[in-house]
């Protein structure tokens, strides 16, 4: 590793005193090309060490997180607020299934536009079991369980939560900010809960408290807190 600290500042230092660089000095029998390759490798090794240090720092910020640590710079537009009116219970219970699906897709598009997503996820409605919904990054689709459509607040919570996951995956590919890197590292080390035979989940707390899940919940709260 290249050392750059503790270098004397005087201009008349004898060569043998500049010891910090002696550990990367190529042997005298090396050719010019071998010496160049040697120095290049030293720089590469130093860069890898720096990358490992950064990765460890990111990893330390991924797990054991809570929503009160997350600050999301996002405000609901008038358009989004207007669409959310469709999900208030008195209105929602009078709507047909087709009208509900239209409102879901309209909200997804409005949120996706606000998040500046490259592509709005397709909405897939299924008659599922115990899952509210999920986002599939490979196909850019959000699957929603129609069995929970009777609760419009929970539906909005699920939809916006999964829309945030779509945003996270997009930003993890861009990698322009520290938060983008957090998304990337978390997805690379994502913890999924495992169902237990007798009911319940294994690793649920680890799943629940990882950064991308905490961030998605905090984002969804911005919508549901206006509906209660």
Model-predicted regions and their roles:
Residues 119, 177-228:
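Metalloprotease/metallohydrolase-associated module, dominated by Zn2+-dependent proteases
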Residues 114-143, 148-153:
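Catalytic zinc-binding patch centered on the HExxH motif and its immediate surroundings
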Residues 14, 28, 36-47, 56-63, ...:
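Residue-level detector of alpha-helical secondary structure
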Residues 163-179:
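Catalytic Zn2+-binding segment of zinc metalloproteases
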Residues 97-119:
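Zn2+-dependent metallopeptidase catalytic core
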Residues 151-167:
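Short alpha-helix carrying the canonical HExxH Zn2+-binding catalytic motif
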Residues 1-17, 41:
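Non-Sec secretion/translocation targeting segments of pathogen effectors
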Residues 71-98:
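A short, surface-exposed helix-loop junction/capping segment
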């Amino acid at each position: 590793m290249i050392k750059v600290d503790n270098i004397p500042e005087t201009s008349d230092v004898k060569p043998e005193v500049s010891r910090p660089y002696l550990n990367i000095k190529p042997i005298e029998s090396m050719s010019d090309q071998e010496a160049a390759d040697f120095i290049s490798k030293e720089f590469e090794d130093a860069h890898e060490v720096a990358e490992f240090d950064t990765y460890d720092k990111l990893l330390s910020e991924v797990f054991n997180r809570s929503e009160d640590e997350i600050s999301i710079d996002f405000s609901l537009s008038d358009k989004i607020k207007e669409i959310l009116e469709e999900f208030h219970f008195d209105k929602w219970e009078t709507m047909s299934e087709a009208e509900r699906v239209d409102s879901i897709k309209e909200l997804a598009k409005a949120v996706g536009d606000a998040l500046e997503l490259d592509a709005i996820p397709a909405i897939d409605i299924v008659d599922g079991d115990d899952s509210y919904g999920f986002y599939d990054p490979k196909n850019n689709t959000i699957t929603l369980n129609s069995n929970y459509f009777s609760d419009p607040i929970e539906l909005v919570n699920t939809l916006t939560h999964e829309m945030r996951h779509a945003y996270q995956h997009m930003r993890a590919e861009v990698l322009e900010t520290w938060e983008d890197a957090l998304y990337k590292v978390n997805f690379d080390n994502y913890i999924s809960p495992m169902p237990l035979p007798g009911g319940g989940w294994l690793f649920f707390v680890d799943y629940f408290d990882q950064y991308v899940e905490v961030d998605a919940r905090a984002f969804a709260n911005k919508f549901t807190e206006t509906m209660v």
